[in-house]
């Protein structure tokens, strides 16, 4: 079976800026891998290329053995994606959004249970635009995992959360690992990477510094 994520010599430029520079990366099954680095290090761009949102300028990417762009329709149902800053429908209620995502899966997690686990029960009927930033982040995480994907990409999953919410999210990510889900997360917090990851890859200026 192919490894869940494989990048070979991946480069992405935006004008004169090289966001990712010749990156090699391999993620093993059921591994939690943290991409650790400061803002602007190239972490989000790396994840966006793996998700098929951004096309690399050079190198090759395989996710679950597939090309994230050419095979996106086949890949999409098998991966969970949590975007930085949430990315929901402003007028949709929290529970509606989660139920909509769950409906695309043959064997979803129970949306009501997931909302409760993430402390969103009281916000279930609140529209997305009226949720706090931390609530939007937690809802984005719920949407990423409700379909029981094989592989989850989490971009700064606890950004803007208080300490209690952060611990709840950490426990949920730990549960994904125990269930055999492969997780790739980005963070600029060393403590978060150490707490969650089986392997930490430090990225700066779009290149791997250490692993």
Show the residue positions of the predicted features.
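Conserved ABC ATPase "signature" region
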Residues: 99, 103, 108-123
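Catalytic Walker B motif of ABC-type/P-loop ATPase nucleotide-binding domains
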Residues: 152-156
């Amino acid at each position: 079976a192919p490894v869940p994520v494989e990048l070979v010599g991946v480069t992405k430029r935006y004008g004169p800026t090289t966001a990712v520079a010749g990156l090699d990366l391999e993620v093993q099954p059921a591994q939690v891998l943290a991409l650790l680095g400061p803002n602007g290090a190239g972490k989000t761009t790396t994840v966006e290329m793996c998700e098929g949102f951004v096309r690399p300028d050079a190198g090759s990417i395989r996710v679950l053995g597939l090309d994230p762009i050419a095979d996106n329709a086949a890949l999409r149902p098998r991966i969970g994606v949590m975007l930085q800053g949430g990315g929901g429908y402003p007028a949709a209620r929290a529970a509606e959004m989660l139920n909509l995502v769950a409906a695309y899966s043959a064997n979803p997690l129970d949306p009501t249970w997931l909302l409760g686990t993430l402390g969103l029960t009281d916000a279930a009927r609140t529209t997305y635009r009226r949720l706090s930033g931390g609530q939007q982040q937690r809802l984005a995480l719920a949407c990423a995992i409700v379909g029981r994907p094989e592989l989850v990409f989490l971009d700064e999953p606890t950004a803007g959360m208080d300490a209690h919410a952060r611990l709840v999210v950490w426990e949920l990510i730990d549960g994904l690992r125990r269930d055999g889900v492969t997780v790739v997360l980005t963070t600029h917090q060393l403590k978060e990477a150490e707490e969650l990851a089986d392997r930490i890859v430090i990225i700066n200026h779009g290149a791997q510094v250490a692993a």
